[in-house]
């Protein structure tokens, strides 16, 4: 019984931690921020032809400067100490903002060290193709919501986005996406939408 109570208290604290970090992340969803609705390759500099990772859809970026067809961007988020090559959207939730190849020369700076189980607050600066950005993330969420409802409610009752937590949604969607009309290029747009409107994050509330 004591173990059950302790487990419940831990899960409650973890839920609060994710919600609080999501609120902080939501603050980035404001003026001056840009978003993409597709996966973008990221590069170490303005001229490199070799990608070092990927920027995933609907994550806020600050465009620092442009050079030719490239833009230098800054992305802020959280770093799980056990996964050094990924910047996550929220503390404790595996919502990927930027994922670097493990062998790539990436640079993730720690802004604030996490304590008592919290993840580090971090930022990274990379280059991407400058096209395809928009300040209207809600339009991207609406597009993803439409695809989810039209494609995933055909064979069975459509689960509410809040029926699962952020960490559960990627594998759940991937298990059924082959039976839907969702195109490969839109897969991560829908996943990020579901994660950011899940039971423990839910930007839509």
Residues covered by each model-derived region:
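Short, Lys/Arg-enriched N-terminal segments with co-localized hydrophobic residues
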Residues: 3-14
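The canonical Cys-X-X-Cys-His
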Residues: 148-159, 190
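C-terminal capping alpha-helices of c-type cytochrome domains
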Residues: 180-205
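Electrostatic cytochrome c docking/interface patches
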Residues: 121-145
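Sec-dependent N-terminal signal peptides
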Residues: 18-27
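Gly/Gly-Pro-rich "capping" loops immediately C-terminal to redox-active cysteine motifs
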Residues: 157-180
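SH3/SH3-like beta-barrel superfamily modules
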Residues: 54-127
């Amino acid at each position: 019984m004591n173990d059950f109570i302790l487990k419940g208290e831990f899960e409650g604290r973890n839920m609060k931690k994710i919600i609080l970090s999501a609120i902080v992340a939501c603050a980035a969803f404001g003026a001056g921020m840009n978003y993409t609705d597709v996966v973008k390759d990221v590069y170490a500099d303005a001229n490199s032809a070799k990608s070092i990772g990927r920027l995933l859809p609907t994550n806020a970026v600050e465009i620092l400067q442009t050079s030719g067809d490239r833009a230098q961007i800054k992305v802020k988020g959280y770093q799980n100490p056990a996964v050094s090559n990924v910047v996550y959207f929220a503390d404790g939730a595996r919502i990927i903002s930027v994922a670097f190849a493990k062998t790539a020369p990436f640079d993730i700076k720690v802004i604030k060290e996490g304590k008592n189980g919290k993840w580090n607050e971090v930022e990274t600066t990379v280059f991407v193709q400058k096209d395809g950005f928009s300040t209207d993330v809600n339009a991207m969420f609406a597009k993803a919501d439409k695809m989810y409802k039209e494609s995933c409610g055909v064979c069975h009752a459509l689960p509410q986005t809040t029926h699962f937590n952020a960490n559960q949604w990627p594998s759940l969607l991937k298990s059924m996406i082959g039976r839907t009309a969702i195109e490969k290029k839109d897969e991560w747009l829908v996943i990020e939408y579901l994660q950011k409107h899940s039971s423990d994050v839910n930007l839509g509330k």
